[in-house]
C-alpha cells in the first residue's frame, strides 16, 4: 500500500488489500463505491480518504481523474488521510 496524490493534490491510498479494508471497516462484504462490484479477493483497491470511499482499480482510475481538490476541505482531508495511514500502517 502506498499513499499518493493526484495531479491536483488529492490524497489516495493505492493497492489496498480487501482483508485490510474488512479489518478497518468491520464490513465483511465490501463493494466498489462506483460500480458496486464485490471486492472480496481484490488486493489492488484505491481508497480516497476525503470521500471515505474505496474503488476497484478500474473505477478508481476514472474517479481519480475527475476528483476536484477544494482548499476548504484541506483540514478534513488531512485528518482522514492520517487516520487511514495510521490504521493501515502507512508512512505519511
How does the language model describe each region?
Residues 29-35, 48, 56:
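Short cysteine-rich clusters marking metal-coordination/redox-active sites
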Residues 32, 42-43:
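Glycine-centered loop/turn motifs
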Residues 33-38, 72-75:
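Cys/His-coordinated Zn2+-binding motifs and related Cys/His-dense segments, i.e., zinc fingers/knuckles
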Residues 43-53:
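Short linker/helix segments within small regulatory modules
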Residues 1-28, 65-92:
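Short, intrinsically disordered terminal segments enriched in charged and Pro/Gly residues
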